[in-house]
Amino acid sequence: MPGAVDLGTGVYVPGQELSRAYLLAGEAALRGGVTCVVVSPSPARPAITCADSLREHRRAAAGAAVPVLFLGGVTWGTTPLDLADLQAAGAVGFSCSLSDGGAPDTAALGETLLRKVMAELTALDSVLLVHAEDAAELGSAQGPADQRLPRAERRGLERVIAAARMAGTRTHVCPFTAAECAALLE
């Protein structure tokens, strides 16, 4: 029977051991018809930004009810060697944010680093998942309803598309919510 793949799952339960968090996440996924989860590097603790933390997560996920795959987190401090090490340790792709990575150790990437990372990931034949909101356009939004301004997503998506075209990087934008951005993908 076919099932869904949850791309970018956040696995973190405050106060629980990591293995327990994976057990709970796997059971919840299976109940919802999800047969594979791809874990986002954040809000995981430790954040999946180096090979050692990825190995820790892989061990903890060994008892999950569904197959678990992992994304490596790209941050301002990520080097080409870090990317290669994460891939060698089992990262099936990488994830970053242009505005807020969800945790201090997965902070937003600037334009120059985004382009460098994309070039490295193209060389590694890997994929990059990007939370594409332009941080400057977000300003000081207050509350969840104000945080996903369509123009912020459009500007972020424009930056990601330009960088991906230049580097040839396979890129997935997530989440994607502003209907006006669909025309950019044609």
Residue ranges and their predicted role:
Residues 3-9, 37-39, 68-72, 92-96, ...:
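Hydrophobic faces of well-ordered beta-strands that scaffold small-molecule active sites
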Residues 8-13, 69, 99-103, 168:
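Short, basic, glycine/proline-bearing loop/turn elements
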Residues 11, 42-46, 72-77, 100:
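Acidic, glycine-rich active-site loops and adjacent beta-strand->loop/helix elements
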Residues 18-26, 76-86:
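Short, acidic/polar
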Residues 33-38, 64-68, 161-171:
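Short, surface-exposed connector motifs at secondary-structure boundaries
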Residues 81-186:
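Histidine/acidic residue-rich metal-binding segments in metalloenzymes
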